[in-house]
Curated annotation (Swiss-Prot):
GO biological process, one term: translation
Subunit-level organization: Heterotrimer of A, B and C subunits.
GO CC field: glutamyl-tRNA(Gln) amidotransferase complex
General function of this protein: Allows the formation of correctly charged Gln-tRNA(Gln) through the transamidation of misacylated Glu-tRNA(Gln) in organisms which lack glutaminyl-tRNA synthetase. The reaction takes place in the presence of glutamine and ATP through an activated gamma-phospho-Glu-tRNA(Gln).
One GO molecular-function entry: glutaminyl-tRNA synthase (glutamine-hydrolyzing) activity
Protein name: Glutamyl-tRNA(Gln) amidotransferase subunit A
Length: 493
């Protein structure tokens, strides 16, 4: 029998319903795995007592034949989802001992469906980063290793802890957040399905903000079916979030295994020109095009002329919003406060923020403050907003001809810890292919589609029309079926 912690969400639900094992046994299998792989630093707060208590309640519900859709399923939450009575830090010193007195809407939705929380996962500080190296709790190590080298690799970011937890069989599924690629890029680096729904599908209430017009909750799973199950539980209108979309939660599970006949898939191959993409990624892209063609889809060559400006636009808009959002951390109401005798209020602000924020967060606050200053507002911020609209228009034009768009999730395979972190510009380019869809607020997923020559997983990104999570899952499921001969499992786990 498969080890319990290696079961998918769907298989776990089936096993629990059939009384093959209990939720308590399932949770204990995950706890054992977490204890065994603490060196990966995937979790920053463990909630094992809570998980076992929730598992007991789940077992009672199964005994009475009254289970919810996620009854007894162990999941992890990125440490920017507020959890009532449980430390929530966004992996920043400024919030290191913050304990919220309310629950985020997304975690509440999962609890309402019977989910069992194992703990809070590590992340880049305030979700700013793409390698999970800016956390105040230290970096996360990927469960994966290259076949020609034993060096520690990054899991991607900013949701690196969630990616490592699911990839290393330390959670059945894990919540992440995606602002410019923080679910899709780590999913690509760790061989997982990472899904970011349409902006507004999941409530942002109770999520620690980075860039409010871009932030969206997402999910990591080990199968596309699991992704559809988790999304149905997470999504839904919430009056506590003014950007929440008032739309029914669609049925998504029937998308799995659906026919690709008559589907048109857009491929913007011109975005891969100029040597930005590693050859292995280019090969995966071409192989996936053939796979979808053989499955009955029509491949359409498209262009997204303004997508190449995506990174520049993102690194004006996101820091601008962050500099505003992060102004609330001042040492007055909650979080860290640095004090000394006879200091003024301004000195307290200055010392608290200097001690509380890490280098990358300070860098982005300064960029944001600069682009919002009166002398730069027109030249940077307003111009970036105009180009953002052009990026969205490109997608609208493309979707007049196609049902979904195919792009790699990342231009490279996972790299070594410390390899690129001294050059912020190179780090920012990790999100080259994920940012455009974020700027347009579109649903998108990364699905494992191949291995590099060094045996590392590579993810293919599928982008859909607004509110069309169904077709994204349909394409992702077809790709998943086409590569089922490949084992996307790290060695030694």
């Amino acid at each position: 029998m498969t080890e319990l912690n290696k079961l998918t969400v769907a298989d776990s639900v089936k096993g629990l319903k059939n009384k093959d094992f209990t939720s308590k046994e399932l949770v204990n299998a995950h706890i054992k795995q977490i204890e065994k792989h603490k060196n990966l630093n995937a979790y920053v707060t463990e909630t094992f007592d809570l998980a076992l208590k929730q598992a007991e309640a789940a077992d009672q519900n199964y005994a009475q034949n009254q289970p919810q859709t996620l009854e007894g399923i162990p999941f992890a939450a990125k440490d920017l989802f507020c959890t009532k009575g449980i430390r929530t830090t966004a992996c920043s010193n400024i919030l290191k001992n913050f304990i919220p007195n309310y629950e985020s809407s997304v975690t509440q939705n999962i609890f309402d469906k019977g989910g069992v929380m194992l703990g809070k996962t590590n992340m880049d500080e305030f979700a700013m980063g793409s390698a999970n190296i800016t956390s105040c709790f230290g970096n996360v190590i990927s469960p994966w290793k290259a076949n020609d080298d034993n060096a520690d690799l990054v899991p991607g970011g900013s949701s690196g802890g969630s990616a490592a937890a699911v990839s290393g069989f330390m959670a059945s599924a894990a919540l992440g957040s995606d602002t410019g690629g923080s679910v899709r890029q780590p999913a690509s680096f760790t061989g997982l399905v990472g899904f970011k729904p349409t902006y507004g599908r999941c409530s942002r209430y109770g999520m620690v903000s980075f860039a409010s017009s871009l932030d969206q909750a997402g999910i990591f799973t080990r199968s596309v079916l699991d992704s559809s199950i988790m999304l149905e539980a997470m999504m839904g209108f919430d009056e506590k979030d003014s950007t929440s979309i008032k739309a029914e939660v669609p049925e998504l599970q029937s998308a799995i295994g659906s026919s690709m006949k008559n589907m048109k898939i857009g491929v913007p191959l011109s975005l891969g020109e100029g040597g930005i993409i590693e050859p292995d990624i280019m090969k995966m892209w071409q192989d996936t095009i053939e796979l979808l063609k053989n499955a009955g889809a029509e491949i359409v060559d498209i262009t997204l002329p303004h997508a190449k400006y995506g990174v520049a636009v993102y690194y004006v808009i996101a820091p601008a919003e962050a500099s505003s959002n992060l102004s609330r951390y001042d040492g007055v109401r909650y979080g860290l406060r640095v004090e000394r005798e006879n200091m003024t209020l301004d000195e307290m602000y200055e010392m608290t923020r200097s001690a509380g924020f890490g280098e990358e967060v300070k860098r982005r606050i300064m960029i944001g403050t600069y682009v919002l200053s009166s002398s730069c507002m027109d030249a940077y911020y307003l111009k970036a907003q105009k180009v953002r609209r052009l990026v969205a228009n490109d997608f609208n034009n493309a979707f007049a001809k196609v049902d979904a768009i195919l792009l790699p999730a990342a231009p490279t395979e996972a790299f070594k810890i410390g390899e690129k972190q001294n050059d912020p510009t190179i780090m920012y380019l990790n999100d080259l292919f994920t940012i455009p869809a974020s700027l347009a607020g579109l649903p998108c997923a990364s699905v494992p589609a191949g291995l590099s020559a060094r045996g590392l997983p590579l993810g293919m990104q599928i982008i859909g029309k607004q509110l069309d999570e169904y077709n994204v899952l349909k394409v992702a499921s077809t790709i998943e079926s086409g590569v089922k001969h490949i084992k996307f499992e790290p060695k030694g786990f």
